[in-house]
From Swiss-Prot:
InterPro entries per the UniProt record, alphabetical: FAD-bd_PCMH, FAD-bd_PCMH-like_sf, FAD-bd_PCMH_sub1, FAD-bd_PCMH_sub2, MurB, MurB_C, MurB_C_sf, Oxid_FAD_bind_N
Encoding gene, per UniProt annotation: murB
A single Gene Ontology CC term: cytosol
Name this protein carries in UniProt: UDP-N-acetylenolpyruvoylglucosamine reductase
Pathway: Cell wall biogenesis; peptidoglycan biosynthesis
Amino acid sequence: MKNITFKEKINLSNYTTIKVGGFAEYFSKPNNTDEFINLINWASLNNQKCRIIGAGSNLLINNIFLKGLTICTKKMRSIKIESHSGIVEVEAGVMLPTMSNILAKKGLQGGEWTVGIPGTVGGSICMNAGSKQLSLANNLLSVRVIDTKTLKISEIEKKDINFQYRFSPFQQNNLMIISAKLLFEPKGNIEQLLETTQKNLKKKTDTQPYHLPSFGSVFKNPTNNYAGKLIEELGLKGFKIGGAEISTMHGNFIVNNSFANSKDILDLITVIQQKVLQKKGIFLEPEVRMIGFDYP
């Protein structure tokens, strides 16, 4: 099979934004769609478990040896833009901040909010990532996927995808996202779009601990409430377990103070859940995807 290159026993802490992770038995960073598909085929033919990571945000990987193939999509960065129609075709590994700035420079409106999301397009669709009432699903036309069981490649229209708050079926099925078609509003004022994009980024960096390793948001917001607000009301900001700490800037962020391991972080998540449930009667559901754990 052509274009199959991977490394062995790779430390995945280098590929997560929280800087924690175990070792991958096999690891590869495909440069394009063809290489990605070939890797999926190789894993299937060799009976290897296959897991996909993007930017590594919203991801907690246990400090264990992970058998099988781990694919990181961050080199899959192709973007094709039809400026007149607003249709944008992006590979799964395109970073949202990169896409946001490109859209603004092309006068395409509707992606300004994504500048503050430290994830890839594929990961963001899979997790249905968003900010307040916005999510990438709002702009989605279709997703191109490969089935890891049948190896069939297909295109799924948005109407056939059951998106929910911070959830998509891709979290549970065998379909891996290759690329997506998105629609943005053309003929926007470039100067205004760039200004809005920069304001959105500044708001994020002023209120969230971007200078330290973190997941992004740890918990989903409960109905008519905010996880960060609940955590702050209990005086938990700054609370630590090992090298893991609840951010003093934002209650819904856990930061790694250079030596945290996966147990520290999982224990801290559990303590937060217990305290909020005990004091507020609300169970906080993690937004973080967990690999290598029996959770929940």
